[in-house]
């Protein structure tokens, strides 16, 4: 259920139907190679969330396109907000969800760079002693693993993935064997968008820029250091992937269907959970 499509007079019923669970997709507007749109993180994550919500009803708050992308302004179209503003937007958004009756809020993260930001925000809610819970769910937690899919196929259960042709399966074997770089604009992200919005993907440009790591300062990471340039210096084209020109809509729909089901199961888990709510209530009592 999209928040913006619910009539005001039906809102209380929507809260009841969702068991007080509201979901907000948090992404980023940035380059993902030359073959994917700038809004990739929200586009594919929101598509998954909306399909999952049809299986396991939750209310979906307007998406937050603006994520952590400091220092990447050289790519046209990138949108960069200050960290303070993003934290304020998250706080105000969650406050409004709670005011409207939602006591369980799931922030579905579609951008790897948001992970620390969202985890920090979730803990910051405790400082205000709010009576609602914030859960952070990284969207890629629900993605299938190609090696797991191939094991299922090799066990004689090819029917589990009815859309895949023999050529698709062989391509996935080839990619799994030869893949060295992934994580941004890669086979998985591209497949999700091919499954949802193939009109937004230009596979003729998938190899236009290099997606391999430069390992520019990887020696510092290996020594235990974090620097704000780790990822940017390793992937200066804002693309982290080996070539995956064999990717297609069939593979995309197959991966998408699995991900939607896993995401729906995650929503169900939070709807049915009572332990976190009980812990929060006990904790709030101790703070008085």
At which residue positions do the language-model features occur?
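Extended, histidine- and acidic-residue-enriched regions that form the cofactor-binding/catalytic faces
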Residues: 1-84, 88-104, 112-288
């Amino acid at each position: 259920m999209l928040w913006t499509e619910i009539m005001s007079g039906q809102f209380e019923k929507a809260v009841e139907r969702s068991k007080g669970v509201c979901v907000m997709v948090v992404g980023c507007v940035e380059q993902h190679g030359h073959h994917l749109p700038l809004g990739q993180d929200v586009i594919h994550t929101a598509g998954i969330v909306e399909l999952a919500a049809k299986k396991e009803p939750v209310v979906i708050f307007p998406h937050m396109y603006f994520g952590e992308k400091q220092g990447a302004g050289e790519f046209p179209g990138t949108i960069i907000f200050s960290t303070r503003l993003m934290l304020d937007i998250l706080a105000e958004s969650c406050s409004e969800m709670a005011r409207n009756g939602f006591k369980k809020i799931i922030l579905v993260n579609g951008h790897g760079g948001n992970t620390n930001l969202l985890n920090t925000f979730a803990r910051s809610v405790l400082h205000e002693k709010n009576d609602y819970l914030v859960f952070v769910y990284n969207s890629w937690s629900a993605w299938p693993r190609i090696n797991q899919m191939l094991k299922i196929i090799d066990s004689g259960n090819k029917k589990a993935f009815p859309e895949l042709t023999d050529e698709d399966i062989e391509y996935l074997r080839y990619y799994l064997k030869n893949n060295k770089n992934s994580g941004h604009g890669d086979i998985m992200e591209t497949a999700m968008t091919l499954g949802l919005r193939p009109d937004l993907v230009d596979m003729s440009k998938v190899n236009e820029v290099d997606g391999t790591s430069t390992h520019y300062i990887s020696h510092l990471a290996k020594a235990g250091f974090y620097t704000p340039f780790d990822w940017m210096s390793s992937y200066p084209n804002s693309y982290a992937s080996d070539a995956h020109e064999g990717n297609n809509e069939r593979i995309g729909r197959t991966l998408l269907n699995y991900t939607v089901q896993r995401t729906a199961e995650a929503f169900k888990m939070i709807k049915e959970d009572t332990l976190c709510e009980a812990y929060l209530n006990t904790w709030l009592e101790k703070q008085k």
